[in-house]
């Protein structure tokens, strides 16, 4: 009887040990992922985008020694009401540090429903550049609505704030070291600062609080190969999707 009790105690102890080790590893990877993103997210907000010309970012052997790199700034909102087409609006800006010049485009896309028999998007691009921290079209635009949208556009990096990133806990963590691919997902509330900012700027047709997804590829400690994206997912299901995407990344300048 005593032997059975001892075996049971040992078994329970080993079980708790395994659970503790597994939990510890998960928490460790979560902190690694957050720390990897924090290098970039700690720069938010950058109200004057021209300040990026003086920010070095992560560099590795993919950069030529004389190349300061190009910052790539992206923000977009995608809205697909239930059973309808998806409407996407966003902007991409390339900021070349060596020449302190920019080029990019504002885009509008309508992605048709798959139940129409074909998957087709209808992206239209409007080339832009930045002058004195203002985005301006480089070609004539007849559509006054599009002109106004470009004039009023702000990248998320200009108003987002992740000072509370370290407070996000118990995320849904995914990590594949072979690819490598990694992500951390957190449920937010509508009282979250960044959620309030998005609702202030976009007509988001749902009261649901979003999930924040930090997703990336490449070495967790830093790499110019791969990407790091953030996404606020308000709705994600078949036939209905609402999400906001953003990224800020330094890459070698060739072909920009």
Curated annotation (Swiss-Prot):
InterPro entries, alphabetized = Csa, Csa_sf
Q: Which GO terms describe its cellular component?
A: plasma membrane
Q: Which PROSITE patterns does the annotation name?
A: PROKAR_LIPOPROTEIN
Q: Name one Pfam family in it.
A: DUF576
What domain of life does the native source organism fall in?
Bacteria
Signal peptide bounds:
1-24
UniProt key word Electron transport: no
Q: Where is the lipid attached (S-diacylglycerol cysteine)?
A: 25
Which key words tag this protein in UniProt? Cell membrane, Lipoprotein, Membrane, Palmitate, Signal
Keyword flag Lipoprotein: yes
Topology with respect to the bilayer: Lipid-anchor
Query: Where does it reside?
Result: Cell membrane
**Residues with a covalently attached lipid (N-palmitoyl cysteine):** 25
The family annotation for this protein states:
Belongs to the staphylococcal tandem lipoprotein family.
Protein's name in the database: Uncharacterized lipoprotein SAB0040
Q: What is the lineage of its organism?
A: Bacteria, Bacillati, Bacillota, Bacilli, Bacillales
């Amino acid at each position: 009887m005593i032997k059975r009790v001892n075996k049971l105690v040992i078994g329970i102890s080993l079980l708790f040990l395994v659970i503790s080790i597994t939990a510890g590893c998960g928490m460790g990877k979560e902190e690694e992922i957050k720390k990897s993103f924090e290098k970039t997210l700690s720069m938010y907000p950058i109200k004057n985008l021209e300040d990026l010309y003086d920010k070095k970012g992560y560099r590795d052997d993919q950069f030529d020694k004389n190349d300061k790199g190009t910052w790539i700034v992206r923000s977009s909102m995608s809205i697909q009401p239930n059973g309808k087409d998806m409407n996407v609006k966003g902007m991409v800006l390339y900021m070349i540090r060596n020449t302190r010049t920019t080029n990019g485009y504002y885009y509008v896309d309508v992605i048709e429903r798959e139940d129409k028999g074909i998957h087709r998007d209808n992206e239209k691009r409007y080339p832009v550049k930045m002058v004195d921290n203002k985005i301006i079209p480089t070609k004539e635009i007849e559509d006054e609505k599009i002109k106004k949208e470009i004039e009023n556009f702000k990248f998320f990096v200009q108003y987002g704030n992740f000072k509370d990133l370290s407070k996000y806990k118990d995320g849904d963590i995914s990590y594949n070291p072979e690819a490598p691919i990694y992500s951390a997902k957190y449920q937010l509330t509508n009282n979250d600062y960044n959620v309030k900012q998005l609702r202030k700027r976009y007509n988001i047709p749902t009261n649901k609080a979003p999930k924040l997804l930090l997703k990336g590829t490449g070495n967790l400690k830093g790499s110019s190969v791969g990407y790091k994206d953030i996404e606020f997912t308000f709705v994600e299901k078949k036939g209905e999707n609402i999400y906001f995407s953003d990224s800020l990344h330094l890459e070698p300048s060739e072909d920009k």
